[in-house]
Amino acid sequence: MSFHDRAETLLVRAILGGFGALSPVAASNLGGRIMRAIGPLMPSNRVAIDNLRHALPELSAAEHRRIARQAWENLGRVLAELVHLPGILQQTASGPGLELVCSDLITAALQAQPPAIFFSAHLANWEILIPQGIRMGGRMGGIYRAPQRSGVDGLLTRLRHIAAGRAFPLFPKGGKGGRDAFAHLRGGGKLAVLMDQKLNEGISVPFFDRPAMTAPASAKFALHFRCPLVPVHIERLGPARYRMIAEPYVEPPASGDTERDVMIVTARINQIIEGWVRARPGEWLWMHRRWPSE
């Protein structure tokens, strides 16, 4: 591990330790306030405003700035809540906790013999999906974008394992990760994928009426294994409080034209995610370069 890797890991550990010393609500509020203040000053805020301008042109510039501030605040809350995930995953009537909607759809997919693919997006607190699926009895793994610093990657992975109550496989995006995810599904495992990030090697399908390079692996896996794609998204109800919602499965077509079927399934996934984002735009990660630069 390099000096910079060790230094950054120690810094992240110290920050998370500070949040861990607070209550879940206090940590969430503090993280949100910090990022709401500094996020709009960061270069990636220009990406967020540009994305909003193209995706939601019917809104005013002031509304775009407001949504961008909300997105920064949500990101700060997500980071601060990482150390409090075990408590957040408790099903409570109020305060920190999680509400489940249509959980029978999740349970059925987790308990079914064939593999299943759960897709979601960077909405509200996306770190909830896999740990909650494991707590519900699923043998889940996930595809993720690994941080550049291996020490930070290991630290975040340990926090995710603590939230789930046990270790689970995470497959870095890329060729080897894709092959390992395929093997996990072939062995009867379940896979969670966040489908809203740009993949330069992906396929171009519409997202907010603009071509967006999108990973086709989930569609290809579903077609290969003839397994359902389960839409699941998270909504923020307050500091450290969430609702996880499952929707009817996306069943893979069987036209015999694999390339066409992959396009159809991937476009449907983007359409579903777009609906989630339009409903709660302040909870999405607008500062990501989702579309090609113009």
Describe every region a protein language model picked out.
Residues 3-4, 58, 65-69, 108-111, ...:
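Non-catalytic C-terminal accessory region of glycerolipid acyltransferases
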Residues 101-103, 143-145, 171-175, 247-249, ...:
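Conserved beta-strand termini and adjacent loop/short-helix elements that scaffold enzyme active sites
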Residues 14, 47, 104, 128, ...:
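Short Gly/charged-rich anion-binding patches and loops
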Residues 92-98, 166-173, 207-209, 255:
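Short, flexible loop segments at the rims of nucleotide/cofactor-binding pockets, characterized by
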Residues 96-99, 123, 149, 171-175, ...:
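A conditional alpha-helix N-cap/helix-loop micro-motif detector
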Residues 112-174, 200-205, 236:
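Catalytic core of membrane glycerolipid acyltransferases/transacylases, capturing the structured
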Residues 1-120, 157-159:
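Membrane-anchoring hydrophobic helices of lipid-metabolizing enzymes
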Residues 46, 103-104, 123, 146, ...:
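Alpha-helix N-cap/helix-start capping motif
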